[in-house]
A protein has these predicted regions:
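Glycine-rich phosphate/pyrophosphate-handling loop used in enzymes and phosphotransfer proteins
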Residues: 1-302
Length: 302
């Protein structure tokens, strides 16, 4: 029997409706006993109240670094610009400041003293050296209090309902230029095996599946982890070293895409610290034949 036939054979409308009704009843009883409260301010009603939504330090894409997504990086953030200088693509006197008074112009060129185009600079920043695998990164908000609580409550206190809240946020930050119908798919950074055993769920896979439904993009489970230590508490250089060989490509995850490797992937993770995790995973995806990989994270360190 084909996969499609097997799925059809398992459909039982009456049982499905009964199960749905029981779930609704269960949810109603739980809500009476344990009312939903905002995870940030504890006000009853929703997981994230409107007042707290307005207080979240969202990163304005118009003022963020166009390459790594750093908040207020404006035209090119210091980190990315330093990377370009180190690779001799921009002269030291062409460094852009955080105010954007030198460096890339809004029209797409560099400062009057430079000759490189924005496209060339972007290629250097995100496609050469250690960052070659990522084409661009976007983050929703800065990982600061009280917003970091959204992620820690979701991951460590197993509030799975927050997966939908995070998926909604991510959906609003997907760059439309990344999406080409039939060519773009979603992939989530998989949880470490130890974390999966401790939590009982893969937190970014849960978010990725919900994001897939919101954006009508296929979700591909094509990455799996190779044993490594926890990244938390490690320095930037230690993170880079720790991530080497930490992911492997799983071709069986392409079954939902009829075995076809997508041209573009939006790679989803929770927090961007140094970028080591995203870069390691993106490298594996590109080695598998994916042409472009865009990073999308819920938060990033300021």
């Amino acid at each position: 029997m084909s996969l499609k036939g097997a799925l059809v054979a398992r459909e039982h409308p009456v049982l499905d409706r009964l199960a749905s009704g029981l779930n609704v009843a269960k949810g109603g009883v739980e809500e009476l006993l344990w009312p939903t409260r905002c995870v940030l301010c504890d006000v009853p009603g929703t997981l994230l109240c409107e007042d707290c939504r307005l207080e979240i330090p969202y990163i304005d894409a118009l003022h963020a670094c166009p390459y790594c997504g750093q908040a207020y990086g404006k035209l090119v953030c210091i980190d990315c610009n330093s990377f370009m200088v180190a690779h001799r693509q921009l002269a030291p006197d062409q460094r852009s400041s955080m105010h954007g008074d030198q460096g890339l112009s809004r029209e797409g060129g560099v400062s009057p003293r430079g000759s490189e185009s924005a496209t060339e600079a972007q290629g250097v920043c995100m496609t050469d050296g250690p960052q070659r695998a990522l084409d661009k990164v976007v983050s929703v908000f800065s990982f600061v209090d009280p917003c970091r609580k959204l992620i820690t409550v979701y991951k460590d206190k197993k509030e799975l309902r927050l997966a939908e809240v995070l998926a909604e946020m991510l959906a609003n930050y997907i760059d439309p230029s990344w999406v080409v119908p039939g060519e773009t798919a979603l992939v989530a950074i998989p949880a470490r095996k130890q974390a999966l055993r401790e939590r009982g769920f893969d937190h970014m896979k849960e978010v990725g599946v919900r994001l897939s439904k919101r954006c009508s993009l296929p979700f591909l489970d094509v990455l799996h982890t190779v044993d490594r230590s926890d990244q938390r508490g490690l320095s930037a250089s230690s993170r880079q070293q720790n991530m080497k060989g930490s992911f492997a490509f799983n071709p069986q995850g392409l079954l939902r895409a009829a075995g076809v490797i997508p041209e573009r992937v939006i790679l989803v993770d929770d927090v961007l610290t140094t970028g080591a995790t995203l870069m390691a995973a993106a490298s594996v995806l590109k080695e598998a034949g994916i042409e472009q990989v865009f990073g999308l994270t819920v938060a990033r360190l300021p």
